Amino acid sequence: VPNKYTNDYQGVEIKNGTNYTLTDDILNYEGLEINQSDVMIFHTHTCESYTPTENFAYEESGTFRTTDLDYSVVRVGNSLTDQLTSYGFNVVHDKTYHDYPAYSGSYGRSMATVENLLISHPNTDIIIDLHRDAIADTSYAPSIKIGDEVVSQLMFVIGTDGGGLEHPNWQKNLQFAVKVQKKANELYPGLFRPILLRNSRYNQQLGKAACIIEVGATGNTLEQLSLIHI
């Protein structure tokens, strides 16, 4: 993965970790047609957690991991669900453990969850796998000041078929991320880190606007995360 962004499209920076050349035709989202009313949120790594604080102390089930959903990335999913619902979106937030008790096979289990959810919500295009970024430096806390508050930065991770698995939707997924990030740049410059484009598909073949969103990293705290408005 490149250390810095390799592409800039209308102010949206992208780290291209694939062999694809990102042309304007690939990145242009003007023709993107998706159902914008319904949103699905789930967590492949449900137990991912943040740096504990006095106000947010929790029992770890592993390093920066907890099965207590009040202190894991699921809490961030709850906040995002509340925000999107207040804006009029229909949101399904699944809180199934996919990485506990076994971490290996998480993506296979979360794929089964999403496939089952799509049976009852077949028209959902926006499918968000909400994560906490895993960085070797556990003190790393990507953040930015918005107004008087310090908040955690966000990052889209978009998969492709570069790893050899079928993934006809990856360009649509990327266009969706570019569209959202361009708008976010106008409202909250710097809230998003560069989009990360990878060879793995991360179950994103299941939607026309499917993505991973990394919310902060291990060094961030829930105090910072609670201030995010998307």
Where are each of the predicted segments found?
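Active-site-proximal helix/loop segments of hydrolytic enzymes
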Residues: 107-122, 126, 132-221
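Conserved small/polar residues in nucleotide/adenosyl-binding loops
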Residues: 229-230
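N-terminal catalytic or cofactor-binding beta/alpha core of small enzyme domains
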Residues: 1-123, 135-139
